[in-house]
Amino acid sequence: MRVLGLETSCDETGVALYDSERGLLADALFSQIDLHRVYGGVVPELASRDHVKRMLPLIRQVLDESGCTPADIDAIAYTAGPGLVGALLVGASCAQAMAFAWGVPAVGVHHMEGHLLAPMLEEQPPRFPFVALLVSGGHTQLVRVDGIGRYQLLGESVDDAAGEAFDKTAKLIGLGYPGGPEIARLAERGTPGRFVFPRPMTDRPGLDFSFSGLKTFTLNTWQRCVEAGDDSEQTRCDIALAFQTAVVETLLIKCRRALKQTGLKNLVIAGGVSANQALRSGLEKMLGEMKGQVFYARPRFCTDNGAMIAYAGCQRLLAGQHDGPAISVQPRWPMESLPAV
C-alpha cells in the first residue's frame, strides 16, 4: 500500500510517500520559521495561509522524486489534530479533495501518534511494549505503549510543555525564535555549576511535569544578573546551560520512574525536543545503566514531518480504518482515546 502523508498541524508543511513494502519513498518539508521569527512565535493565520501556498508544490515534488503518479497512490493520510485549527483544516481539505478526485480512502492521523511512531522508520525500530516520552512544543507526556492505539497515559505536564518552556525562556533572556535550538547552542559554551536551577516536581511521587516555575526561576536569575550589570553573552550561556540541565535531568528522573513502575526496559523519545543532544546523551547513559535501550528518530523526523503521518496512517489503513468524506479536525484530541490496531 502506498500512502501519501500530509502534515499541517502548526508551522511546517510536510508531505511524504510511504510504501508498506518498500518503506519511505520520498518526503519534502517546508519550515515557516523565517516567516514567524519576526513575531517571536507562530501566528496562526499566517501559518494557515502559508500551508495553502506550499502544499501542492510539495506534493508535486514528492511524486516527482518517487517516480509515482496519482494513479499509484492507494490512500491519503493527514494530520487531523491536535494543532492549530486553521492549519489542520488546510491539510484535511486538501487530503479529502484528493481522495475524492483519485477515488482512494483518506484517514486522519493523530499528530502525537505520528511522533510516537516516527522511530519505526529507522533501521532498528523499537518493539512493543515500551515507554514513550513525548516532548514537543505542545506536549510533554509519558505513555505506556503496548501496540498501535494501545496507549496508557502515565504522566504529563500540568502547565507548560518542555518545548514551550524552552521557547519562552529563550525569549525572556533575549534570544531568538525558535528558542530550543538557541538555548542548546548557548548551553554548549556555558560554565557548569555557575547556576543551579531546581528540578520541578521531582521531590514528590508521580510522573507529572511542571516547567512554568522553572521558567520564572530563570527569568528572576537573569534579572538579578542584569541589575548587577552582568548581562554578558557568557552569562546568557551559563543560564542557558543551567536551564537545559534542569529540564533534561527532570525528564531523566521521570523516565527512570516510569520504566521502574512499568517494569519495561525500552524507551522511545519523540517530538521536537527529542532532537536535543543533551537529552539523548543523558537517556542513552541512563538506559545503559538500566540494561535497557533508547530509541529515537533521525533529527529531521523529530520535528513535524509528513513521513511520520504517512507511516502512522498506513498502519491504520492496513487495519481497515479510514474516514468518511466529511472534513473534520480536532484541535484538542487525547491520544489514549484512539482505537487499537
UniProtKB/Swiss-Prot annotation:
KW Lipoprotein (keyword) present: no
Database matches in Pfam families: TsaD (PF00814)
UniProt cross-references to SUPFAM superfamilies, sorted A to Z: Actin-like ATPase domain (SSF53067)
Residues noted as binding substrate in the record, renumbered to the chain: L134, V135, S136, G137, G138, D167, G180, N276
EC number: 2.3.1.234
GO cellular component labels: cytoplasm
Cofactor binding notes: Binds 1 Fe(2+) ion per subunit.
Subcellular localization, as worded in the UniProt entry: Cytoplasm
Biological process (GO), any one: tRNA threonylcarbamoyladenosine modification
Location, primary (coarse class): cytoplasm
UniProt key word Transcription regulation: no
Top-level taxon in the UniProt lineage: Bacteria
Cofactor(s) listed in the protein's UniProt record: Fe(2+)
Reaction(s) this enzyme catalyzes, per UniProt: L-threonylcarbamoyladenylate + adenosine(37) in tRNA = N(6)-L-threonylcarbamoyladenosine(37) in tRNA + AMP + H(+)
Binding site for Fe cation: H111, H115, D304
Broad EC category: transferase
Protein purpose: Required for the formation of a threonylcarbamoyl group on adenosine at position 37 (t(6)A37) in tRNAs that read codons beginning with adenine. Is involved in the transfer of the threonylcarbamoyl moiety of threonylcarbamoyl-AMP (TC-AMP) to the N6 group of A37, together with TsaE and TsaB. TsaD likely plays a direct catalytic role in this reaction.
PANTHER family named in the record: TRNA N6-ADENOSINE THREONYLCARBAMOYLTRANSFERASE (PTHR11735), TRNA N6-ADENOSINE THREONYLCARBAMOYLTRANSFERASE, MITOCHONDRIAL (PTHR11735:SF6)
Similarity-based family: Belongs to the KAE1 / TsaD family.
Protein name according to UniProt: tRNA N6-adenosine threonylcarbamoyltransferase
Source species: Pseudomonas aeruginosa (strain ATCC 15692 / DSM 22644 / CIP 104116 / JCM 14847 / LMG 12228 / 1C / PRS 101 / PAO1)
